[in-house]
Amino acid sequence: IIYVAAQGAVNGPTKERGIYKSMDGGKSWKNVLFVNELSGASELSIDYNNPKVLYATMWEHQRLPWKVISGGEGSGVYKSTDGGDNWFKIENGLPNELGKLAISVSRANSDKVYLLAESDSNKRLGGLFVSNNAGESWSRISKYAELTSRSWYYIEVFADPNDENTVYVLSARAFRSIDGGKTWERIYSGHGDYHDLWINPNNSKNMIISD
């Protein structure tokens, strides 16, 4: 079984967006989550303690020659408990206006889910949100602006697989929190613009970061 989060074209509407699932090793695919022709999947996180539980973030966006649009009615957070066959929104406690989103469920505690959310920058409504009940409700734990400073291009969040209170955020810079997102320290690793992070599930000190 393979899942793909497809963001889709940036410059116009298309039906080729959302969450796709393959049951035959990639030979054929089914779109299991589609919102609208302007909203693609920006992230997918699987609960490794129960792989039928999936969390997906959808992002409505357009990059036009004269402006960039991030956010809209299509942006939102979704959960499936049956391997992607059915989805429902989980937005209790989140801002009404959502832009780009990233999500990560903790392998150390399946009830804890981290959500990095772009929202109205003028009102500073975005930041890092945490759910302690598997997405039923959310609370903002940090409004530190640098966590979403390059949200159009890349914002990522990664829960440490062995410690539910350690979480990493990648943006123009890389950050780590060891208190569940309340405070942050910068990670220095050569060039900035960090895009991805792998943490060894058997040894959290063994990591690979890419820019």
Predicted regions and their residues:
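Beta-propeller blade termini and top-face loops
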Residues: 1-211
